[in-house]
Regions:
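Short, often N-terminal, low-complexity regions
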Residues: 12, 21, 26-37, 42
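Short hydrophobic alpha-helical segments enriched in small aliphatic residues
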Residues: 25, 41, 47, 53-56
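Conserved amphipathic alpha-helical "coupling/scaffold" segments
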Residues: 57-221, 255, 262-265
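Extended, charged coiled-coil "arm/hinge" scaffolds of SMC/Rad50-like chromosome-maintenance ATPases
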Residues: 220-244
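Charged, surface-exposed helical/loop "interaction arms" that form contiguous linear patches used
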Residues: 237-281
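ATPase nucleotide-binding head domains, primarily ABC-like/P-loop NTPase cores
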Residues: 279-496
Length: 496
């Protein structure tokens, strides 16, 4: 897959004079190196976009392919059927922009093994530094940077005049500028201290953070503030405020933005580490270029006191999961897929350990709706969805494909024959892994001796006239037949 590059424009009023805008284009190159292209446009644009800024973080990495149906099935950002969204697990960041970056991470899984490992190693690092400022201070800096006022060149006479004027009246505008400048000076000093304290054996992501701080601060005029006003109690002069306001919001606006982005990334890593520690998640699942896929001690992250299970793709490229209704087949499929999804985000997974291929795509067919508008039945929706995901497999992508209860919208004989036909087709796509749940035991037994298939079942049984469902995943094919018992048990009160 070719690298996906998000090219961006940072549009910012220069305020050097009223003759135009400075437009900076950033493009990500290699290891976070940035190319800044400077363009100028006419006064006409300045009239329409005074002090306007649009900031988008550039990216140069490859992403795992998926679709809206899969994200809905896994409840990535929105829960269905009263399920919690997966994002809510990791939404407890210290900053608002950290929350936005976490959302970006969890909705955009990677298929770049080095980028995934880089995130994992940083999250697992026990000596992650604290954020240099608290949430309120960082929010104030964001507000200050976007504050819509005239940025002026530093001038001693103007500074003295404005200082005298402010003795006579309270100036809210000046307070915003003064506090914003003071906080950025404090921020730059603390970031420089963080850089100096970065250990030689620190993870690559933290070393890159330290190098970015070094290049940004000491490779520009920002180095002037290092050593100045480290304490909040000391206040810079009015001329100094004007000087650095011009430096921060005009000349090096984009550099300050870049440093803030690094802080939010640190916030994301700290939050993910906190989740891993509190929930016992695995920070570093082993990502591999082979098709080995196995998980030990996995659970669905939102099941209360859920039983942990072990699973692996032990045979071929197809795993058929059987079991009675209510045994937990769909939840198990979701738990496995969520673990694979989070592993590709570089985030901790709800398991003790995991070996996971780096997939090109993840696709599911779990909660398919009917369509009254299109006149499409549930059965037809299933057929079209299976066709859609198999086209992805046919394209040569290495995919994880989840099919939950294929062809439940038709009669048992049709469902059996259709499932067998689909399974024969799946065997051709050796570069993909397929997890299929079914309650049609005849379908599973049809492939019992096929080397392309492995088999697991969710245990359930009737014991002392009670339905026992331990949610235990076991190798083999289920023999449980409890449907009639459940119907009889629930309806027996209707008999007179």
């Amino acid at each position: 897959m070719k690298p996906v590059k998000h090219w961006l424009l940072l549009v910012r009023s220069s305020n050097l004079n009223k003759t135009g805008l400075d437009i900076y284009a950033k493009a990500a190159l290699g290891n976070q190196e940035l190319l800044f292209l400077f363009l100028s446009v006419s006064l006409v644009l300045h009239d329409y976009f005074p002090t306007f800024a649009l900031y988008v973080i550039p990216k140069n990495m490859t992403y795992l392919d998926t679709d809206k149906q899969t994200q809905a099935d896994l409840s990535i950002t929105e829960g269905i059927y009263d399920e919690y969204p997966l994002y809510s697990l990791f939404s407890g960041t210290e900053t608002k922009n950290g929350k936005r970056m976490m959302l970006d991470w969890i909705t955009s899984p990677l298929n770049d093994i080095s980028a995934i490992r880089k995130r994992q190693e940083a999250i697992a690092w026990k000596e992650l530094p604290e954020l240099p400022l608290d949430e309120e201070e960082l929010d104030f800096i964001e507000y200050y940077l976007e504050y819509r006022d005239q940025i002026r060149r530093p001038n001693i006479l103007v500074s003295l005049t404005s200082a005298f004027d402010r003795l006579l009246r309270h100036d809210a505008q000046r307070y915003i500028i003064r506090r914003g400048v003071t906080l950025i000076i404090l921020l730059l000093n603390r970031l420089d201290t963080l850089r100096k304290n970065t250990l030689e054996n620190a993870p690559l992501l933290l070393k890159e953070l330290a190098q970015s701080i070094q290049d940004t601060i000491h490779g520009s005029e920002l180095k002037e503030v290092i050593g100045l006003y480290k304490d909040k109690e000391k206040s810079p002069s009015n001329y100094t405020i004007d000087k650095y306001d011009y430096l921060f919001r005009c000349i090096h606006f984009e550099l300050i933005r870049g440093l803030l982005s690094q802080i939010y990334m640190l916030d994301v890593c700290r939050t993910a580490q906190h989740v891993a520690i509190n929930r016992g998640f695995c920070c570093c699942p082993e990502m591999t270029d082979t098709m080995d896929l196995s998980i030990t001690g996995f659970v669905h992250p939102f099941t209360k006191e859920g039983r942990s299970n072990d699973w692996k793709m032990s045979n071929g490229n197809i795993c058929i999961l059987t079991g009675s209704n209510m045994a937990g087949k769909s939840t198990t499929l979701k738990a496995i897929t969520i673990a694979v999804w989070l592993a590709h985000c570089g985030l901790p997974v709800p398991a003790r350990s995991m070996i996971c291929p780096v997939f090109d795509g993840i696709y599911t067919s779990i909660n398919l709706p009917d369509s009254l508008r299109d006149g499409r039945s549930h059965f037809m929706a299933e057929i079209l969805r299976i066709k859609e995901v198999l086209q992805k497999a046919k394209s040569g992508k290495r995919c994880l494909i989840i099919l939950d209860e294929m062809f439940r919208g038709t009669n048992a004989q049709d469902a059996l024959e259709a499932s067998v036909a689909v399974n024969e087709l799946l065997k051709k796509y050796l570069h993909c892994s397929f997890l299929i749940s079914t309650h049609i035991l005849e379908y599973a037994k049809h492939f019992e001796k096929d080397s392309a298939c492995s088999f697991y079942y969710m245990d359930s049984r009737i014991q002392n006239d009670q339905f026992i469902c331990p949610y235990q995943l076991i190798e083999g094919i289920s023999e449980a037949q409890v449907g009639y018992w459940l119907v009889r048990k629930e309806l027996e009160s209707l008999h007179y």
